[in-house]
């Protein structure tokens, strides 16, 4: 499905944001779906009802599966919020997700201002 009118440029910029996140060494925990079976995190699907990761988001962007940049941003925010919901407040994973959440919010706010949506 093609993006809605006026969303082509914002979605192109979202691809750049996602690629820049994926390139970061410390972003490894967010690149692929959580292997909850392999990690024996059997409660994960009960706690996290909408699993999301940056690799999946990138594939959805490449396949034009987002109508708007806002829908893509929601999925990116799920990556961070899922991590913070599942992991203990103040843990290494929680702190990493919190840091990425803040950075992403800043970049997305800037994108919205520049693209005027």
Walk through the language-model features, giving the residues of each.
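Chromatin reader modules
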Residues: 1-117
């Amino acid at each position: 499905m093609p993006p809605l009118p006026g969303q082509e440029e914002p979605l192109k910029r979202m691809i750049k944001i996602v690629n820049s996140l994926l390139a970061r060494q410390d972003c490894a925990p967010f690149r692929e779906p959580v292997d909850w079976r392999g990690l024996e995190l059997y409660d994960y699907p009960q706690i996290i009802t909408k699993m999301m990761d940056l690799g999946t988001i990138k594939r959805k962007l490449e396949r034009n599966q987002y109508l708007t940049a806002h829908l893509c941003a929601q999925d990116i925010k799920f990556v961070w919020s899922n991590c913070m919901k599942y992991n203990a407040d103040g843990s290494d994973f929680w702190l990493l997700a919190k840091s990425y959440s803040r950075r992403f919010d800043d970049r997305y706010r800037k994108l919205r201002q520049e693209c005027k949506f």
